[in-house]
From Swiss-Prot:
The keyword 4Fe-4S does not apply. Glycans are attached at residue 530. Its EC number is 1.8.4.-. Keywords: Disulfide bond, Endoplasmic reticulum, Glycoprotein, Oxidoreductase, Redox-active center, Repeat, Signal. Disulfide bonds join 158-161, 480-483, 588-591, 700-703. This is DnaJ homolog subfamily C member 10. It comes from Rattus norvegicus (Rat). It comes from the Eukaryota. Residues 35-100 form the J domain. A motif (Prevents secretion from ER) lies at residues 790-793.
Length: 793
């Protein structure tokens, strides 16, 4: 006999069963040493958002705080947390995909937050479709796409950020379609937030391509946010009358732009002024918005058969005085979003390019082309119709091509499924296929970058196997997230390397044979071919580091040492010379991961510390003689003393360029001067030289991190500007008088001889090169001003 359960009991039982199944799944996965993707239950193609959502779901169910009676809860959760830490980080994910866990030995992690953090603080906006969580690699492309963005920079532990979250969600729904609403987690993307000048949370900024970011400082209510946003929306609502009607309509129709017109009679419903403004912003560049006061423009309304309040969309060429015409769209809604969506759906599709004229059309203009097979899949996202307008200033035309009408053409382009591609005005020879998100802002960024870049899509017919010119070739797979992240950086690099080497991409899912020929075992693999020389790139996914890699191939920053040169250059070094040496083996995964960081570090230490490397596979007996017992072994050889063989071994956990440089600089004599209140007053405030001062506190972590950077700065500006340090814990009154409110703080003091006075300025950067460039710029400006003042006298 069956037992009937009521609804609540049934739901509780289902939840219990679901939890049991989830726990069982994780136990099986953890116990069988599955890979990180399996641990989180995501595919290798998962986006950052999907990874966060999967981890949060597991964290809330399996956190040790929720499972106090499970002795294995801590260990099991560490494995899941470790998987998340690696897969959320683009560089670590690339290392893991290429080397597995062996490539992560320098990044052990091992810490996690409380259950309440994952429940209330983690991924605040991941479940809100109207809010786009932006990451560093996509931020600039998004805000420079041409659309208007309002971005919330927040920190997970910030109470004010959580107070704002419900309002931000309501606001996002209110303005959906009018502008893009974004969010940046400064806990995950600290570098991005620092680059954008975010010093407090939440910080709200408006972004649009071509204009400086505008910070919002007003009340955090939905109404105030909407009012502020509307100030930056491009809106033009035209009041139509007998005097301007014909000219306004004909001018727009001639440009291929239709009109949305609301006819208003007193006492009847028509679109409010606020709704008209919103629609004008939402339809900017697509449709003009106007209104007619039929009480004062009676004859105009009668000529258009408008006898009651109504709203209609008139496409270009529509007959206005015949409302029976099927081309006119009458709208019954008074809601801006509903009207917007209905009009967007009714806008014409992109031009269908014919097979016999395709080559000619692509040879004379730059095009963004949607390829489809039979059914046009773009109709599912009507917002893409904005592309034509948003790309107009870039002189990019937008069209579509049906591959079922000419399969041979698509086959020659290696197009075997629906996609979109940019053609650069040279027919079908120069093109690039889009592998990113099929959403408006991502496509816009791709199109703008691609037409101006010099990236060639490679295949068997144009692969530079025997080309005399140097090539940088990226072997990739479209499903691979790190590959997709690298592509925009390659475009940036290609413009800066134009004329020096060529840049191409090869899709290994299509050209498997070519990739196998070059023994490509992981994606992305980026290789420089220079005739017989082949060099694999191992650095971060940034244009800057790609350029550094190319420069290092031309002018190596690391000396490759042999036993003979090691003896001559290191052991017999001059008295004032110092060396840092990396003993490595080519087969060692941590060594491979270290090498690009080692080269990067070497470039920043030019003129200060000599940097070398020894291949212990090639010189095994020599390394044994030098007592090298592990790889990589990093040693610092200080200024020569009576003990020529003295060295210091690096035992730090982090082997990135910044950490290694800080370690090496720590052995050099201090270049800056420690100042007391008396010497600060005498030498800086009353002295006759230029100074840059680091105000710090010994207990301050950022101060400790900045200390070696300041020492590097002191050496870079030696002879031009003196560098000093003031301990604000020991001398608080000196720092208070100097206006210091945070540590570390850097201030520049320039002495003006004519006035015998000191000019001072706060410096916000923490990068030695940036500060040095800023100081030299200020000196040049300062000296020019002094010269002008003399000339005037």
């Amino acid at each position: 006999m069956g037992v009937w359960l009521n609804r609540d009991e049934f739901i509780r039982d289902v939840k219990r069963i679901s939890l049991c199944l989830l726990v069982l799944y994780v136990v099986i996965v953890v116990g069988t040493d599955q890979n990180f993707y399996s641990l989180l239950g995501v595919s290798k193609t998962a986006s950052s958002r999907e990874i966060r959502q999967a981890f949060k779901k597991l964290a809330l169910k399996l956190h040790p705080d929720k499972n106090p009676n499970n002795p294995n809860a801590h260990g099991d959760f560490l494995k899941i947390n470790r998987a998340y830490e690696v897969l959320k980080d683009e560089d670590l994910r690339k290392k893991y995909d290429k080397y597995g866990e062996k490539g992560l030995e320098d990044n052990q992690g091992g810490q996690y937050e409380s259950w309440s953090y994952y429940r209330y603080d983690f991924g605040i906006y991941d479940d809100d479709p109207e809010i786009i969580t932006l990451e560093r690699r996509e931020f600039d492309a998004a805000v420079n796409s041409g659309e208007l963005w309002f971005v919330n920079f927040y920190s997970p532990g910030c109470s004010h950020c959580h107070d704002l979250a419900p309002t931000w969600r309501e606001f996002a729904k209110e303005v959906d379609g009018l502008l893009r609403i974004g969010a940046v987690n400064c806990g995950d993307d600290r570098m991005l937030c620092r680059m954008k000048g975010v010093n407090s949370y939440p910080s709200l900024f408006i972004f649009r391509s071509g204009m400086a970011a505008v910070k919002y400082n007003g009340d955090r209510s939905k109404e105030s946010l909407v009012s502020f946003a509307m100030q930056h929306v491009r809106t033009t609502v035209t009041e139509l009358s007998t005097g301007n009607f014909v000219n306004a309509i004909e001018t727009a129709f001639a440009a291929g732009i239709g009109w949305l017109i609301t006819f208003c009679f007193k006492g009847e419903d028509c679109l409010t002024p606020q709704t008209r403004l919103r629609l004008s912003g939402m339809l900017d560049g697509l449709v003009n918005v106007g209104w007619v006061d039929c009480d004062t423009q009676d004859s105009l309304c009668k000529s258009l058969d408008a006898t009651a309040s109504t709203t209609a969309y008139f496409p270009p060429g529509a007959t206005l005085n015949n409302k029976e015409k099927s081309s006119v769209l009458f709208l019954n809604s008074l809601d801006a979003k509903e009207i917007y969506m209905e009009i967007i759906h009714n806008l014409p599709d992109f031009e269908l390019l014919s097979a016999n004229k395709l080559e000619d059309r692509l040879a004379h203009h730059r095009w963004l082309v949607f390829f489809h097979f039979g059914k046009n899949e773009n109709a599912n996202d009507p917002e893409l119709k904005k592309l034509k307008t948003l790309l107009k200033n870039e002189h990019i035309q937008v069209g579509r091509f049906d591959c079922s009408s000419a399969p041979g053409i698509c086959s020659d382009l290696y197009v075997f499924q629906s996609c979109l591609a940019v053609f650069k005005g040279q027919g079908t020879k120069e093109y690039e296929i889009h592998h990113g998100k099929k959403i408006l802002y991502d496509i816009l960024a791709f199109a703008k970058e691609s037409v101006n870049s010099h990236v060639t899509t490679l295949g068997p017919q144009n692969f530079p196997a025997s080309d005399k010119e140097p090539w940088l070739v990226d072997f990739f797979a479209p499903w691979c997230p790190p590959c997709r992240a690298l592509l925009p950086e390659l475009r940036k690099a290609s413009t800066l390397l134009y004329g020096q080497l060529k840049v191409g991409t090869l899709d290994c899912t299509i050209h498997e044979g070519l990739c196998n020929m070059y023994n490509i075992q992981a994606y992305p693999t980026t290789v420089v071919f220079n005739q017989s020389s082949v060099h694999e790139y191992e650095g971060h996914h940034s244009a800057e580091q790609i350029l550094e890699f190319i420069e290092d191939l031309r002018n190596p920053s690391v000396v490759s040492l042999t036993p003979t040169t090691f003896n001559e250059l290191v052991k017999q070094r001059k008295h004032d010379e110092v060396w840092m040496v990396d003993f490595y083996s080519p087969w060692c995964h941590p060594c491979q991961v270290l090498m690009p960081e080692w080269k990067r570090m070497a470039r920043t230490l030019t003129g200060l510390i000599n940097v070398g490397s020894v291949d212990c596979q090639q010189y095994h007996s020599f390394c044994t003689q030098e007592n090298v017992q592990r790889y990589p072994e990093i040693r610092f050889y200080p200024q020569k003393s009576s003990r020529a063989y003295q060295y210091h071994s690096y035992n730090g956990w982090n082997r990135d360029a910044y950490s290694l440089r800080s370690w090496g600089l720590g052995f050099l004599p201090q270049a800056s001067i420690d100042l007391t209140p008396q010497t600060f007053n005498e030498k800086v405030l009353q002295g006759k030289t230029h100074w840059v001062i680091d105000f710090y506190a010994p207990w301050c972590g950022p101060c400790q991190n900045f200390a070696p950077e300041f020492e590097l700065l002191a050496r870079m500006i030696k002879g031009k500007v003196k560098a000093g340090k003031v301990d604000c814990q020991a001398y608080p009154q000196t720092c208070q008088k100097a206006g210091i409110r945070a540590y570390p703080s850097v201030k520049l003091y320039l002495y003006e001889r004519a006035k015998k006075s000191i000019w001072e300025e706060q410096i916000n950067s923490r990068d030695a090169k940036t500060i040095a460039a800023l100081i030299y710029g200020k000196l040049e400006t300062f000296q020019s001003q002094v010269k002008r003042n003399k000339d005037e006298l």
